[in-house]
């Protein structure tokens, strides 16, 4: 069986780190910036960055509606931090009208942006992660948390009493950045779900 073709949305954020993590996890990974690139992948990673800026860039690059359509059709996706925000069906504090973060609707959840605080409030913490042996060292940078999950959403990890990792079918999202730690278990979990 050939390796899954996984794209990393390369408009902003930890693109290189996700590409490296996906390759180490056994995927064939490449960047996605254009519609033809989006249409050529089996799954997509939406990296961290700034969710309102990423929404703006998705519109500018003509990817917003095609990406929503691919997700609605069942394309697997993994979102970290801002990627988690964008994969939500609802964003609790989307931002200023006209420059707000736009939900893509992949996971039935409500997410609050910057819920753990501003940049200076960023932190690291070991979290227990359902389905993985041992804790995951989680790096939270202006991180969101999940305020509501739908009935088909599994909560995989919590921090501060709030869900910070969730899965719905072949959609995975984390409020933290596993791509920057060298621990590839979250990426391996996502890649394994593609087979």
From Swiss-Prot:
Keywords: Glutamine amidotransferase, Hydrolase, Lyase, Pyridoxal phosphate
Molecular function (Gene Ontology), one example: pyridoxal 5'-phosphate synthase (glutamine hydrolysing) activity
Record EC number: 4.3.3.6, 3.5.1.2
GO biological process, one term: glutamine catabolic process
Spans through the membrane: none
Active-site positions on this chain: 81, 177, 179
GO cellular component, one term: glutaminase complex
Positions bound to L-glutamine: 49-51, 113, 141-142
Pathway(s) per entry: Cofactor biosynthesis; pyridoxal 5'-phosphate biosynthesis
Reactions listed under catalytic activity: aldehydo-D-ribose 5-phosphate + D-glyceraldehyde 3-phosphate + L-glutamine = pyridoxal 5'-phosphate + L-glutamate + phosphate + 3 H2O + H(+); L-glutamine + H2O = L-glutamate + NH4(+)
Segment forming the signal sequence: none
PANTHER family to which the protein is assigned, alphabetical: PYRIDOXAL 5'-PHOSPHATE SYNTHASE SUBUNIT SNO (PTHR31559), PYRIDOXAL 5'-PHOSPHATE SYNTHASE SUBUNIT SNO1-RELATED (PTHR31559:SF0)
Family according to the record: Belongs to the glutaminase PdxT/SNO family.
Assembly notes: In the presence of PdxS, forms a dodecamer of heterodimers. Only shows activity in the heterodimer.
Stated role: Catalyzes the hydrolysis of glutamine to glutamate and ammonia as part of the biosynthesis of pyridoxal 5'-phosphate. The resulting ammonia molecule is channeled to the active site of PdxS.
Designated name of the protein: Pyridoxal 5'-phosphate synthase subunit PdxT
Gene: pdxT
């Amino acid at each position: 069986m050939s390796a899954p073709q996984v794209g990393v949305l390369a408009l902003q954020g930890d693109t290189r780190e996700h590409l490296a993590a996906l390759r180490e996890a056994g995927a064939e990974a490449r960047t996605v910036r254009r519609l033809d690139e989006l249409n050529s992948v089996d799954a997509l990673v939406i990296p961290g960055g700034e969710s309102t800026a990423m929404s703006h860039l998705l519109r500018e690059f003509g990817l917003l509606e095609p990406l929503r359509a691919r997700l609605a059709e069942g394309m697997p996706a993994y979102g970290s931090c801002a990627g988690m925000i964008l994969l939500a069906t609802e964003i609790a504090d989307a931002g200023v009208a006209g420059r707000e973060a736009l939900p893509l609707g992949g996971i039935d959840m409500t997410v609050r942006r910057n819920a753990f605080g501003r940049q200076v409030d960023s932190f690291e913490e070991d979290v227990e992660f359902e389905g993985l042996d041992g804790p995951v060292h989680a790096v939270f940078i202006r991180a969101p948390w999940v305020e509501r999950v739908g009935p088909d959403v599994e909560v995989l990890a919590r921090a501060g009493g709030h869900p910070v990792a969730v899965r719905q079918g072949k959609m995975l999202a984390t409020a933290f950045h596993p791509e920057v730690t060298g621990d590839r278990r979250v990426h391996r979990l996502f890649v394994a779900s593609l087979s």
